[in-house]
């Protein structure tokens, strides 16, 4: 019997996948527990449409991420911070401050978790910061730290 999984089932498949199972397993276990539904033409068509819509959404997100990456690659962010005479900052600049400055200077809402800093910035100078925008898309943003 072919069924559509309504939830992830360990050892069988993920949600919305169509699987072939024994009739008894489907009728006595999967269907009563709302883990699966019998496959009908309407349900199969609905799942196909849902997968196509999901694919289009992923493609759109990918295009937006590529556009954003191009914009960030061409941009730079200038951060002013208090520093001592030798160029050492009082405190440090973390990915949260960089995200705030991207929002303020470029008007782009950026999640601080997407900004990759090995260590917080503690010196005046120019840095290249990696920003993970999407799976496989990483933008390099130039960050200039100056003393205020």
Swiss-Prot record:
Keywords: Ribonucleoprotein, Ribosomal protein, RNA-binding, rRNA-binding. Pfam families: Ribosomal_L9_C, Ribosomal_L9_N. One of its GO terms (molecular function) is rRNA binding. GO terms for cellular component: ribonucleoprotein complex; ribosome. PANTHER family: 50S RIBOSOMAL PROTEIN L9. Binds to the 23S rRNA. Belongs to the bacterial ribosomal protein bL9 family. This is Large ribosomal subunit protein bL9.
